[in-house]
């Protein structure tokens, strides 16, 4: 009887710790449903129906492992990835890392900020510039929560992630996909032609976000409660739940595009405005509005996460700190310049993804090296199998991004 009480008590304590430590992965998961993912998934679904859903499944599993490694580094060492690079690499290398990480954070933010502005434009009927002003105001308001600590921000961003997931449950209801074909697309790999291979690479290549790798390790480095092993165990639950939700959203995006566009002959849908305008007559005004709202929620939350990540890389690499509102003001400027110059926002989205591809290997390689170092990690060091899987992911993601980069540059030129 006493043993049962002890077991129940320890089980309750473990659940309580899991709940207390839940949140960092929800912030990280937002990076996986940003407007860049909207554009890629919609294009893939419209062009190839359910045939590329399996790519989303595998991309999400890879991303899950990478986020677990990032979170584990923070828990095991009490330092984030940028700080570890600063401590272990020569100063010129550290400065190079900082500059490229800042450029990538700004390129990512450009895509996310413009994505949210497009969302406001679509649902409110305002101009893209007015949408950008609304995006700026909304992100400042969300960032103000940081003054009250990490938890309120985690709750708001987690809420926005759940809102986007709920929006796509509604979209699935409206579009009524063929569940048998959907299931087949998730399980059976298919690449019907070279364009499908390129789009599949786009889905996979755009999934892993370097700025989120830096950020996640900083969100877990100051976690308290329980032993390191217990915190790591709780964090695995956090990552599993948050990334499963993000994975569902990506699957639902592609499945909705397949059901609504591909099977009605609209296979050429390539941008967010086009998707919104085509959804309305095909499904309903409500379906188009829900799409617009989900784009705003994803854009706002991901641009906030991008601002936080930029702060982490600056403090981690060069120990320099500027107020978040100053950083937000500076990183908004490229978006306003792009809009005022009248440049094509979808083209800018694509080009920002190209810039992003440069930083993936630079974040992944040191992450794997540090988490495989027994002196640094102690009992949380990577197992041999995790190391092997990790390096396979690195090689695959880097190869795909190089291929994507070459293909995109040739396509843009």
From Swiss-Prot:
Can you say where in the cell this protein is located?
A: Cell inner membrane
Residues in the Periplasmic compartment per record: 40-51, 119-125, 176-196, 259-276, 345-350, 407-413
**Name the record gives this protein:** Divalent metal cation transporter MntH
Q: Topology versus the membrane, per the UniProt entry? A: Multi-pass membrane protein
Q: What is its main location?
A: membrane
- UniProt organism field: Salmonella enteritidis PT4 (strain P125109)
Per the record, what ranges lie on the membrane's Cytoplasmic side?
A: 1-19, 72-95, 146-155, 221-238, 298-327, 371-387
User: Which keywords accompany this UniProt record?
Assistant: Cell inner membrane, Cell membrane, Ion transport, Membrane, Symport, Transmembrane, Transmembrane helix, Transport
- Provide the taxonomic classification: Bacteria, Pseudomonadati, Pseudomonadota, Gammaproteobacteria, Enterobacterales
| Purpose of the protein | H(+)-stimulated, divalent metal cation uptake system.
TM stretches of this protein: 20-39, 52-71, 96-118, 126-145, 156-175, 197-220, 239-258, 277-297, 328-344, 351-370, 388-406
